[in-house]
Regions:
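A structured, mid-to-C-terminal "fold-capping" secondary-structure block
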Residues: 26, 35, 133, 138-239
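Active-site flanking loop/helix segments enriched in acidic
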Residues: 63-70
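Mid-length scaffold segments of soluble, non-membrane domains
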Residues: 78-156
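Bacterial Sec-type N-terminal signal peptides, specifically the leucine/valine-rich hydrophobic h-region
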Residues: 17-19
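Beta-rich strand-turn-strand
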Residues: 72-75
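Post-signal peptide N-terminal segment of mature Sec-exported envelope proteins
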Residues: 29-59, 77
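Bacterial N-terminal signal peptides that target proteins for export
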Residues: 1-12
Length: 239
């Protein structure tokens, strides 16, 4: 299995070529000028999900003991908290930095390397943050909406931040590479399993699933960035 960074770079290169190929395309939504290409990539991602990822995630959910699923979720959540501490610090948020940092310390020690989420039980709230959010906090506009092959919804800003997020993930430092990739696959399957229950509901409420997911993603990212002080981050959205 290739290294995660190689996969991400391939996805980004594919996305760039696709967008360059339709650079003159004018979409109906100003936030989604590459909608025609994005829809094709989204359809490809959906086919991969239905053929591979969803069945594997369903088997994982059905046959893996709930306790083991919980420990997997807790372990990778604790790793994500490490990078959140860094980004909350970069956003000059002392409360969020301290509280998330305390979660990491407690869960990594008393919680046995994050397998047990002690932090939540003692009232330490999780404040998730990534580098795309940090860029937005400091005023970088989101840019156009894009769909990345195999990775899904994003924006120009979040795509630019993706490699930084990948390198900032503590799991990216794990060696040997085979063990690292096994963990990446397990985290992906576990994350997909957590959203299995949403599939039917999404199909029921969304007349156009692509538009629904796009609008929900953009709204979520705006809300996450707006946790900080006002900036021109929403300049594109407000036009």
């Amino acid at each position: 299995m290739p290294r995660l960074t190689s996969i991400v770079r391939l996805c980004l290169a594919t996305l760039l070529l696709a967008l360059v190929g339709c650079a003159s395309t004018s979409g109906g939504n100003p936030l989604d000028p590459f909608e025609a290409t994005n829809r094709k990539i989204d359809a490809f991602n959906e086919s991969v999900d239905q053929a591979v990822l969803k069945p594997v995630a369903k088997s994982y959910q059905d046959y893996t003991p709930n306790l083991l699923q919980t420990t997997v979720k807790n372990f990778f959540g604790n790793l994500r908290d490490v990078w959140s501490v860094v980004n909350n610090g970069l956003q000059l948020k002392p409360k969020e930095t301290a509280e998330t940092g305390a979660r990491v310390v407690v869960n990594s020690t008393i919680g046995l390397y994050g397998l047990i989420d002690v932090g939540t039980h003692i009232g330490l709230q999780r404040h998730t943050a990534d580098f795309g959010q940090t860029l937005g906090y400091w005023g970088m506009p989101a840019g156009p909406y894009v769909v990345i092959p195999l990775l899904g919804p994003s924006t120009a800003r979040d795509t630019a931040a993706l490699l930084v997020d990948r390198h900032g993930d503590p799991w990216s430092q794990i060696n040997p590479v085979a063990s690292r990739n096994q963990g990446v696959a397990l985290r992906l399957v576990d994350k997909r399993a957590q959203f299995l229950g949403m599939d039917d509901r999404l199909n029921e409420v969304a007349l156009d699933k692509y538009s629904f997911v796009r609008d929900a993603y953009l709204q979520k990212r705006r809300a996450e960035v707006r946790r900080g002080p006002p900036s021109d981050v929403d300049e594109l959205e407000e036009k």
